[in-house]
Protein backbone atom coordinates (compact mmCIF):
# COMPACT_ATOMS: atom_id res chain seq x y z
CA UNK A 1 0.00 0.00 0.00
CA UNK A 2 1.23 3.49 -0.86
CA UNK A 3 -0.51 6.33 0.93
CA UNK A 4 -2.50 9.02 -0.84
CA UNK A 5 -0.97 12.41 -0.16
CA UNK A 6 -3.23 14.96 1.55
CA UNK A 7 -2.31 18.12 -0.35
CA UNK A 8 -2.62 20.90 2.23
CA UNK A 9 -1.28 23.47 -0.19
CA UNK A 10 -4.06 22.82 -2.72
CA UNK A 11 -6.80 22.64 -0.07
CA UNK A 12 -5.59 25.89 1.51
CA UNK A 13 -5.59 27.59 -1.90
CA UNK A 14 -9.17 26.44 -2.46
CA UNK A 15 -10.18 27.94 0.92
CA UNK A 16 -8.46 31.24 0.08
CA UNK A 17 -10.29 31.37 -3.26
CA UNK A 18 -13.64 30.84 -1.51
CA UNK A 19 -12.80 33.50 1.07
CA UNK A 20 -11.86 35.99 -1.64
CA UNK A 21 -15.24 35.41 -3.30
CA UNK A 22 -17.03 35.92 0.05
CA UNK A 23 -15.13 39.17 0.68
CA UNK A 24 -16.05 40.41 -2.81
CA UNK A 25 -19.70 39.55 -2.13
CA UNK A 26 -19.56 41.47 1.16
CA UNK A 27 -18.17 44.54 -0.58
CA UNK A 28 -20.82 44.36 -3.31
CA UNK A 29 -23.49 44.16 -0.59
CA UNK A 30 -22.09 47.32 1.02
CA UNK A 31 -20.61 45.46 3.99
CA UNK A 32 -17.26 46.09 5.63
CA UNK A 33 -14.13 44.20 4.60
CA UNK A 34 -12.75 42.02 7.46
CA UNK A 35 -9.64 43.36 9.19
CA UNK A 36 -6.76 41.48 10.82
CA UNK A 37 -4.08 43.04 13.03
CA UNK A 38 -0.80 41.12 13.29
CA UNK A 39 1.64 42.00 16.07
CA UNK A 40 5.28 40.87 16.03
CA UNK A 41 7.55 41.57 19.00
CA UNK A 42 11.27 41.30 18.24
CA UNK A 43 13.13 40.03 15.19
CA UNK A 44 13.04 36.23 15.45
CA UNK A 45 13.71 35.08 11.84
CA UNK A 46 11.18 32.19 11.92
CA UNK A 47 8.49 34.47 13.37
CA UNK A 48 9.21 37.07 10.70
CA UNK A 49 8.65 34.44 7.99
CA UNK A 50 5.37 33.26 9.57
CA UNK A 51 4.09 36.81 10.01
CA UNK A 52 5.02 37.68 6.43
CA UNK A 53 3.04 34.67 5.16
CA UNK A 54 0.00 35.67 7.21
CA UNK A 55 0.08 39.26 5.96
CA UNK A 56 0.44 38.14 2.35
CA UNK A 57 -2.48 35.68 2.68
CA UNK A 58 -4.62 38.47 4.17
CA UNK A 59 -4.02 40.71 1.20
CA UNK A 60 -4.65 37.85 -1.23
CA UNK A 61 -8.21 37.32 0.05
CA UNK A 62 -8.93 41.05 0.26
CA UNK A 63 -8.82 41.54 4.03
CA UNK A 64 -7.50 44.72 5.61
CA UNK A 65 -4.10 43.81 7.06
CA UNK A 66 -2.54 45.93 9.80
CA UNK A 67 1.04 45.25 10.86
CA UNK A 68 2.65 46.19 14.15
CA UNK A 69 6.37 45.38 14.45
CA UNK A 70 7.53 46.13 17.99
CA UNK A 71 11.09 46.15 19.26
CA UNK A 72 12.29 43.30 21.52
CA UNK A 73 12.64 45.87 24.31
CA UNK A 74 8.90 46.66 24.14
CA UNK A 75 7.40 46.39 27.63
CA UNK A 76 4.50 44.14 28.53
CA UNK A 77 2.45 47.23 29.41
CA UNK A 78 3.06 48.74 25.95
CA UNK A 79 1.96 45.53 24.23
CA UNK A 80 -1.17 45.26 26.39
CA UNK A 81 -2.00 48.91 25.64
CA UNK A 82 -1.79 48.21 21.89
CA UNK A 83 -4.10 45.20 22.31
CA UNK A 84 -6.59 47.37 24.23
CA UNK A 85 -6.52 49.88 21.38
CA UNK A 86 -7.18 47.16 18.78
CA UNK A 87 -9.91 45.59 20.93
CA UNK A 88 -11.78 48.90 20.64
CA UNK A 89 -11.09 49.40 16.91
CA UNK A 90 -14.29 48.56 14.95
CA UNK A 91 -12.35 48.00 11.71
CA UNK A 92 -10.38 45.10 13.26
CA UNK A 93 -12.06 41.68 13.53
CA UNK A 94 -9.03 39.64 14.53
CA UNK A 95 -5.91 40.26 16.62
CA UNK A 96 -2.94 37.95 16.30
CA UNK A 97 0.17 38.20 18.49
CA UNK A 98 2.97 36.05 17.07
CA UNK A 99 4.36 33.61 19.64
CA UNK A 100 6.82 33.02 21.21
CA UNK A 101 7.17 36.37 22.97
CA UNK A 102 10.37 37.67 24.63
CA UNK A 103 11.01 36.25 28.10
CA UNK A 104 9.96 39.44 29.93
CA UNK A 105 6.42 39.25 28.50
CA UNK A 106 3.98 36.68 29.87
CA UNK A 107 2.23 34.78 27.04
CA UNK A 108 -0.90 33.98 29.03
CA UNK A 109 -1.45 37.60 30.06
CA UNK A 110 -1.24 38.71 26.41
CA UNK A 111 -3.53 35.93 25.14
CA UNK A 112 -6.14 36.72 27.79
CA UNK A 113 -6.02 40.46 27.02
CA UNK A 114 -7.32 39.88 23.47
CA UNK A 115 -11.12 40.03 23.43
CA UNK A 116 -12.50 36.49 22.86
CA UNK A 117 -14.48 37.69 19.82
CA UNK A 118 -11.21 38.93 18.22
CA UNK A 119 -9.10 35.91 19.27
CA UNK A 120 -8.66 34.47 15.77
CA UNK A 121 -5.79 32.24 16.95
CA UNK A 122 -8.29 30.43 19.19
CA UNK A 123 -6.00 30.54 22.24
CA UNK A 124 -8.16 32.50 24.71
CA UNK A 125 -9.44 30.37 27.63
CA UNK A 126 -13.02 31.26 26.63
CA UNK A 127 -12.59 29.82 23.13
CA UNK A 128 -10.70 26.74 24.35
CA UNK A 129 -13.49 26.23 26.89
CA UNK A 130 -16.16 26.46 24.22
CA UNK A 131 -14.39 23.70 22.27
CA UNK A 132 -14.15 21.59 25.45
CA UNK A 133 -17.90 22.02 25.94
CA UNK A 134 -18.53 20.85 22.35
CA UNK A 135 -19.85 24.24 21.18
CA UNK A 136 -16.80 25.68 19.38
CA UNK A 137 -16.70 29.21 18.01
CA UNK A 138 -13.21 30.54 17.20
CA UNK A 139 -11.07 27.40 17.05
CA UNK A 140 -7.32 26.95 17.38
CA UNK A 141 -5.97 27.32 13.84
CA UNK A 142 -3.67 24.31 13.41
CA UNK A 143 -6.11 21.70 14.83
CA UNK A 144 -8.94 23.33 12.86
CA UNK A 145 -6.87 23.06 9.67
CA UNK A 146 -6.04 19.43 10.46
CA UNK A 147 -9.74 18.61 10.81
CA UNK A 148 -10.29 20.13 7.35
CA UNK A 149 -7.52 17.88 5.97
CA UNK A 150 -9.01 14.78 7.62
CA UNK A 151 -12.46 15.66 6.26
CA UNK A 152 -10.96 15.91 2.75
CA UNK A 153 -10.08 12.19 2.86
CA UNK A 154 -13.76 11.22 3.08
CA UNK A 155 -12.99 8.87 5.98
CA UNK A 156 -15.67 8.66 8.68
CA UNK A 157 -13.93 9.60 11.94
CA UNK A 158 -16.62 8.22 14.27
CA UNK A 159 -15.23 5.27 16.23
CA UNK A 160 -11.64 5.66 15.04
CA UNK A 161 -8.82 5.10 17.53
CA UNK A 162 -6.78 8.33 17.38
CA UNK A 163 -3.42 9.11 18.94
CA UNK A 164 -2.08 12.65 19.36
CA UNK A 165 1.65 12.81 20.06
CA UNK A 166 2.46 16.09 21.81
CA UNK A 167 0.38 17.95 24.39
CA UNK A 168 1.11 21.63 23.73
CA UNK A 169 -1.52 24.31 24.26
CA UNK A 170 -1.20 25.34 20.61
CA UNK A 171 -1.64 21.93 18.93
CA UNK A 172 -1.83 18.80 21.09
CA UNK A 173 -4.48 19.72 23.64
CA UNK A 174 -6.97 21.45 21.31
CA UNK A 175 -6.33 18.69 18.74
CA UNK A 176 -7.44 16.12 21.33
CA UNK A 177 -10.66 18.09 21.88
CA UNK A 178 -11.29 18.36 18.13
CA UNK A 179 -10.89 14.60 17.66
CA UNK A 180 -13.21 13.85 20.60
CA UNK A 181 -15.77 16.14 18.98
CA UNK A 182 -15.31 14.20 15.73
CA UNK A 183 -16.22 10.93 17.47
CA UNK A 184 -12.73 9.47 17.89
CA UNK A 185 -11.51 7.51 20.90
CA UNK A 186 -8.51 9.71 21.57
CA UNK A 187 -5.24 9.13 23.41
CA UNK A 188 -2.85 12.03 24.02
CA UNK A 189 0.82 11.09 24.39
CA UNK A 190 3.58 13.24 25.94
CA UNK A 191 7.03 12.94 27.46
CA UNK A 192 5.76 10.80 30.36
CA UNK A 193 3.89 8.34 28.10
CA UNK A 194 4.91 4.70 28.35
CA UNK A 195 4.63 2.23 25.45
CA UNK A 196 4.36 4.94 22.78
CA UNK A 197 5.11 2.42 20.03
CA UNK A 198 2.29 0.12 21.14
CA UNK A 199 -0.20 3.00 21.18
CA UNK A 200 0.76 4.19 17.71
CA UNK A 201 0.70 0.68 16.24
CA UNK A 202 -2.97 0.40 17.28
CA UNK A 203 -4.03 3.84 16.00
CA UNK A 204 -6.29 4.40 12.99
CA UNK A 205 -5.33 8.09 13.01
CA UNK A 206 -2.04 9.58 14.20
CA UNK A 207 -1.32 13.30 14.68
CA UNK A 208 2.29 14.09 15.59
CA UNK A 209 3.40 17.52 16.85
CA UNK A 210 6.65 17.31 18.81
CA UNK A 211 9.19 19.26 16.74
CA UNK A 212 11.72 16.43 16.48
CA UNK A 213 12.81 15.26 13.01
CA UNK A 214 11.81 11.67 12.22
CA UNK A 215 10.71 11.07 15.82
CA UNK A 216 8.11 8.44 14.86
CA UNK A 217 9.49 5.48 12.86
CA UNK A 218 7.39 4.79 9.78
CA UNK A 219 7.15 1.07 10.58
CA UNK A 220 5.10 1.89 13.68
CA UNK A 221 2.23 3.09 11.51
CA UNK A 222 -0.68 0.67 11.33
CA UNK A 223 -1.55 -0.44 7.77
CA UNK A 224 -4.32 1.83 6.47
CA UNK A 225 -3.92 4.53 9.14
CA UNK A 226 -4.18 8.27 8.48
CA UNK A 227 -0.98 10.16 9.37
CA UNK A 228 -0.97 13.90 10.06
CA UNK A 229 2.56 15.28 10.53
CA UNK A 230 2.55 18.74 12.13
CA UNK A 231 6.32 18.95 12.58
CA UNK A 232 8.47 21.14 10.38
CA UNK A 233 12.17 20.72 11.12
CA UNK A 234 15.13 22.06 9.15
CA UNK A 235 18.09 19.67 8.95
CA UNK A 236 21.70 20.88 8.77
CA UNK A 237 21.66 20.43 4.98
CA UNK A 238 18.64 22.75 4.74
CA UNK A 239 16.07 20.02 4.05
CA UNK A 240 12.66 20.38 5.72
CA UNK A 241 11.34 17.20 7.33
CA UNK A 242 8.47 16.28 9.63
CA UNK A 243 8.23 14.44 12.94
CA UNK A 244 7.39 11.15 11.17
CA UNK A 245 9.79 9.13 9.00
CA UNK A 246 7.88 9.87 5.82
CA UNK A 247 9.05 7.27 3.28
CA UNK A 248 8.37 4.24 5.48
CA UNK A 249 5.16 5.67 6.92
CA UNK A 250 3.83 6.33 3.41
CA UNK A 251 4.18 2.61 2.65
CA UNK A 252 1.82 1.73 5.52
CA UNK A 253 -0.64 4.63 5.73
CA UNK A 254 -3.76 5.11 3.62
CA UNK A 255 -3.40 8.92 3.77
CA UNK A 256 -0.45 11.09 4.84
CA UNK A 257 0.42 14.78 4.93
CA UNK A 258 3.75 15.81 3.35
CA UNK A 259 6.26 18.20 4.92
CA UNK A 260 6.31 20.89 3.67
CA UNK A 261 2.92 21.42 2.00
CA UNK A 262 0.70 19.56 4.43
CA UNK A 263 -0.43 21.12 7.70
CA UNK A 264 1.48 24.43 7.44
CA UNK A 265 -0.64 26.11 4.73
CA UNK A 266 -3.82 25.04 6.54
CA UNK A 267 -2.92 26.93 9.71
CA UNK A 268 -2.96 30.22 7.81
CA UNK A 269 -6.11 29.26 5.87
CA UNK A 270 -7.88 28.56 9.19
CA UNK A 271 -6.73 31.91 10.57
CA UNK A 272 -8.38 33.64 7.60
CA UNK A 273 -11.56 31.58 8.06
CA UNK A 274 -11.66 32.59 11.73
CA UNK A 275 -11.26 36.26 10.83
CA UNK A 276 -14.22 36.17 8.45
CA UNK A 277 -16.23 34.19 11.02
CA UNK A 278 -15.49 36.84 13.67
CA UNK A 279 -16.60 39.61 11.30
CA UNK A 280 -19.86 37.86 10.41
CA UNK A 281 -20.80 36.43 13.80
CA UNK A 282 -19.68 39.19 16.15
CA UNK A 283 -19.04 42.46 14.35
CA UNK A 284 -21.50 42.89 11.46
Curated annotation (Swiss-Prot):
Binding-site positions, NADP(+): 166-168, 232
Keyword set includes Hydrolase: yes
Listed GO CC annotations: cytosol
Catalytic activity: (6R)-5,10-methylene-5,6,7,8-tetrahydrofolate + NADP(+) = (6R)-5,10-methenyltetrahydrofolate + NADPH; (6R)-5,10-methenyltetrahydrofolate + H2O = (6R)-10-formyltetrahydrofolate + H(+)
Pfam family, one: THF_DHG_CYH
GO biological process: L-histidine biosynthetic process; methionine biosynthetic process; purine nucleotide biosynthetic process; tetrahydrofolate interconversion
GO MF annotation terms: methenyltetrahydrofolate cyclohydrolase activity; methylenetetrahydrofolate dehydrogenase (NADP+) activity
Residues of the signal peptide: none
Keywords annotated in UniProt: Amino-acid biosynthesis, Histidine biosynthesis, Hydrolase, Methionine biosynthesis, Multifunctional enzyme, NADP, One-carbon metabolism, Oxidoreductase, Purine biosynthesis
EC code(s) of this entry: 1.5.1.5, 3.5.4.9
Keyword RNA-binding: no
Pathway recorded for this protein: One-carbon metabolism; tetrahydrofolate interconversion
NCBIfam families hit by this protein: PRK10792.1 (NF008058), PRK14186.1 (NF010783)
Primary role: Catalyzes the oxidation of 5,10-methylenetetrahydrofolate to 5,10-methenyltetrahydrofolate and then the hydrolysis of 5,10-methenyltetrahydrofolate to 10-formyltetrahydrofolate.
Family classification: Belongs to the tetrahydrofolate dehydrogenase/cyclohydrolase family.
Assembly mode: Homodimer.
The protein, known as: Bifunctional protein FolD
Species annotation: Shewanella oneidensis (strain ATCC 700550 / JCM 31522 / CIP 106686 / LMG 19005 / NCIMB 14063 / MR-1)
